[in-house]
């Protein structure tokens, strides 16, 4: 599956969109914040798998039911969305 296919098939769309903030940040903003960092893909992958809080406001992101490979595919796609 591609990152975009996973984004649509998994729960991501409940809180995120590519270009505007919903409950969670827009993926454009995530790409802008982490895409240029050497560990950006790893950071996003970890956040997808284990959850995240405090980076984008008060609402935490829960851990997501995706495989490590799916999380990495999603993260690699997200950083291309600058």
Curated annotation (Swiss-Prot):
Statement: the UniProt record of this protein carries the keyword Lyase: no
Post-translational modification: Binds 1 heme c group covalently per subunit.
Alphabetical list of InterPro entries matching this protein: Cyt_c-like_dom (IPR009056), Cyt_c-like_dom_sf (IPR036909), Cyt_c_ID (IPR002324)
PROSITE patterns: CYTC
Sorted UniProt keywords: Electron transport, Heme, Iron, Metal-binding, Transport
One of the record's GO molecular function terms: electron transfer activity
Binding site for heme c: 12, 15-16, 61
Pfam name, any one: Cytochrom_C
Keyword Cell inner membrane tagged: no
Source domain of life: Bacteria
Entry function: This is a prokaryotic monoheme cytochrome, unreactive with mitochondrial cytochrome C oxidase or reductase. It functions in nitrite and nitrate respiration in Pseudomonas, but it is also found in other bacteria.
Record-given protein name: Cytochrome c-551
Organism expressing this protein natively: Pseudomonas denitrificans
Lineage: Bacteria, Pseudomonadati, Pseudomonadota, Gammaproteobacteria, Pseudomonadales
């Amino acid at each position: 599956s591609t990152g975009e296919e996973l984004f649509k098939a998994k729960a991501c769309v409940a809180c995120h969109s590519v270009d505007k903030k919903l409950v969670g940040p827009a993926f454009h903003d995530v790409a802008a914040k982490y895409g240029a960092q050497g560990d950006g893909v790893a950071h996003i992958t970890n956040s997808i798998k284990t959850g995240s809080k405090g980076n984008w406001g008060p609402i935490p992101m829960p851990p997501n039911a995706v495989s490590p490979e799916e999380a990495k595919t999603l993260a690699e796609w997200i950083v291309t969305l600058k």
